[in-house]
Regions:
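Basic, flexible Lys/Arg- and Gly-enriched helix-loop patches that mediate nucleic-acid binding at interfaces
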Residues: 1-182
Length: 182
């Protein structure tokens, strides 16, 4: 694929789509949503599970994909999480200080209430571990009703309706490549 034009785009993933190139068991994959974006063969960077929504990056730039998905590159991710019941202050503090899951310790860099009823919280993490946000809350006895990734490695889904995508700006691409993001 040497010489192929590099393509970078971001999708606001809707619920019900699997983050996969081709899953024979899936009704719908995210690739259907970006199939008309370009002629180049692009791939999702990282994953959002079928029931999660929000920001998902696509590219054909293998070097950038390796950089962004490698565990040693810590990228800031912010999620808005809707829970089945109010998150107690004690549980929130525990998540901020750190909890131990089956694959090790995890803590939130920041966590805050989004709604007064305390069933919606914003959580900022740098970990790329599989289904980490859901597992944090499930470990604490909460069911996640909705999970929305609103920020990833300096990118936001601002002004992007659910199911829509856009190409990254030259500045966004340069920021990602240089690692100049939180």
């Amino acid at each position: 694929v040497e010489g192929e034009k590099k393509v970078y785009l971001v999708l606001n993933k809707p619920k019900g789509y699997v983050t996969s190139l081709d899953d024979p068991h899936a009704d719908k994959t995210v690739m259907e949503l970006v199939k008309d974006a370009c002629t180049e063969r692009i791939y999702p960077v990282g994953r959002l599970d079928k029931n999660s929504v929000g920001l998902l990056l696509f590219t054909n730039d293998g070097d950038l994909t390796r950089q962004l998905t490698h565990p040693s590159f810590q990228k800031k991710k912010i999620y808005q999480v809707s829970l089945d019941k109010p998150l107690t202050k004690a549980d929130m503090e525990q998540i901020a200080q750190g909890i131990t899951l089956e694959d090790g310790e995890i803590y939130a860099d920041e966590i805050a209430y989004v709604k007064e009823d305390k069933t919606e919280v914003g959580i900022e993490i740098h970990s790329g571990r599989n289904r980490i946000v859901r597992r944090i809350f499930e470990h604490m006895g909460y069911a996640v009703k909705k999970l929305d990734r609103v920020y990833y490695a300096g990118l936001s889904k601002k002004n992007l309706k659910r199911g829509q995508w856009r190409f990254l700006t030259r500045e966004e691409v340069q920021r990602l490549k240089s690692g100049q993001y939180e």
